[in-house]
Amino acid sequence: MATTINPPRDPNTLSNYNNWLSTHITANFDILFDQKKLVGNVIHKLKSITNAESTDIVLDTSHVDVTDVKVDGKPSVWELLPPVKPYGTALKIKLDQGVKMDEIVHVDISVKTTEKCTALQWLTPAQTSNKKHPYMFSQCQAIHARSIFPCQDTPDVKSTIDFNITSPLPVIASGLLVRDASGAPQTGGKNLYQFHQKVPIPSYLFALASGDISEAAIGPRSVVATSPDKLRECQWELEADTENFINAIEKIVYPYVWGEYNVLILPPSFPYGGMENPIFTFATPSIISKDRENVDVIAHELAHSWSGNLVTNASWEHFWLNEGWTVYLERRILAAVHGEAYRHFSAIIGWKALSDSVDHFGHDHEFTRLITDLKGKDPDDAFSSIPYEKGFNFLFHLENLVGKQKFDQFIPHYFTKFKGKSLDSYEFKATILDFFKSDAEASKLLNELDWDTWFYAPGLPPKPKFDTSLVDVVYDLAKKWQSIPESSFKPQPSDIKDLTGNQIVVFLEQVLLFERPLAPELSKLMGEVYGLAKSANIEVANLYFRVGLNAGDESVFEPTADLLGKIGRMKFVRPLYRNLQKVNRPLAIETFEKNKDFYHPICRAMVEKDLFGKKDA
């Protein structure tokens, strides 16, 4: 019989998922706040995808304590192989004999997390908003699920999941709550919470949170969950837009398949803007700006319900298939709700983020390519706005190339063809070429496209012609500031009276681009006249502080350090530390040392690299 060869596409896993596929996971965990660990067991239902040729099952682990392994109910021989940085330690489970193609084995692993777990953050009551109870939450993307339990930690494998979680505090997970069974009292003052995820998902979408959490409706199929003292303001921020966003994207792709779309507003140390955990988006409290200006994050995470969660990149080398598509769909939602000019306005903000990332890495750096080479590398190190914005610009280019009307027909086709599957960039290319093969005009344009340059060239792509109608007014205002002291311009509060928060963001980004930074006294004047230093909108405040740091305005040094102790979102934290260390490195280091235990482990590691260079994990 011929040997079965299933080449693995993901270089960032140690698992032999080319021999076995995890099709269902049962996760039974007890949340132990006093010990800061999860204790329990996971059961993998694994399907053989060879003809009895594999007698080992290899799973990813990282800093987990495995205490027992059973295969089909019987004790098994197993070992932890030597660690392979940065991928952890492979768990090798021996089988008595190979298993025929498509036959199933059940692997039951008893496991505890350890203090080196990179996926979980444990907060003391003091780190929460009402300071009453401890809190824990997970962040598994990209390769951190393996630090909670042994798994095939690759986006190229999808499983359904049953969660059985006991905790003394309410629990949220990336599944639908079994309402009649959940909250059932257990011994020792704990309750059992059960969730089912019936749509197969990759390991990085496994999510748990537990703490003092209350819920309020923000739409007919949506709730917001957060600390009781913040519930009303979070509800107000999100209730106007959430259902409108869902209705808009359902018209662009197809109906939402996950049942509920809910949002968990996390404590401020959450390292990302949002994480698209299915059913419950995990989001930063920095979007609660009391002006509904930052709910674009919700449009983005909602769009992931199609791109990323249903149709998934096969490896992190093709991350643009998750994020580029999601930014594209997010901006289509914004266009449907606010008008086409707003889509272009958002894309202009995105182009600035893309330029910043390319400048940060260097214009010929590997990580500025659309398809990256991550063999032997940590996907977290490659994380930036490049897959988001270069990916968006590629899809926007394709839309303009074939025409929006035609591209609109391709969107549901693509998301139907790969629904429940993972794919790479080459399958994407083959799919769009095949879809348009009967359209001579579109087919010619797509075949003549320089795909290799888009896929592999580092640096910036060609800049599209954006509609600048919403940015021209702020470009003009920035030019007036640049003209001081040569001009007679006198700043007034009325300069920004009619601007949205996002327009003020673009204004400040323009000021950051000045070849000659503002004089310190002008930076200070800007903050005073426009009230920027006191803005409740962190998108605005953090950029104003960066303007001040660039100017060497000492009046922003302490407010910057103060903000760095209140928010853990890397979008703000990393640039602020980079700017602060240029003008006052001792303050930057002192601020980091003071707050490093407040930050999520992922954020802490990235800031350490920014401030001190490479450090061994």
Curated annotation (Swiss-Prot):
Main subcellular location of this protein, as a coarse class: cytoplasm
PROSITE patterns in UniProt: ZINC_PROTEASE
Residue numbers annotated as active site: E301 (proton acceptor), Y388 (proton donor)
Protein name: Leucine aminopeptidase 2
Cofactors: Zn(2+)
Enzyme class: hydrolase
Cofactor binding comment, as recorded: Binds 1 zinc ion per subunit.
One Pfam family here: Peptidase_M1
Positions with a binding annotation for Zn(2+): H300, H304, E323
Alphabetically ordered keywords of this record: Cytoplasm, Hydrolase, Metal-binding, Metalloprotease, Nucleus, Protease, Zinc
Top-level lineage group: Eukaryota
Gene Ontology BP term (one): peptide catabolic process
Record field: catalytic activity: an epoxide + H2O = an ethanediol
GO cellular component annotations of the record: cytosol; fungal-type vacuole lumen; multivesicular body; nucleus; NVT complex
Function: Aminopeptidase that preferentially cleaves di- and tripeptides. Also has low epoxide hydrolase activity (in vitro). Can hydrolyze the epoxide leukotriene LTA(4) but it forms preferentially 5,6-dihydroxy-7,9,11,14-eicosatetraenoic acid rather than the cytokine leukotriene B(4) as the product compared to the homologous mammalian enzyme (in vitro).
A GO MF term: metallopeptidase activity
Binding residue positions for a peptide: Q139, C140, Q141, P271, Y272, G273, G274, M275, E276
Organism taxonomic ancestry: Eukaryota, Fungi, Dikarya, Ascomycota, Pezizomycotina
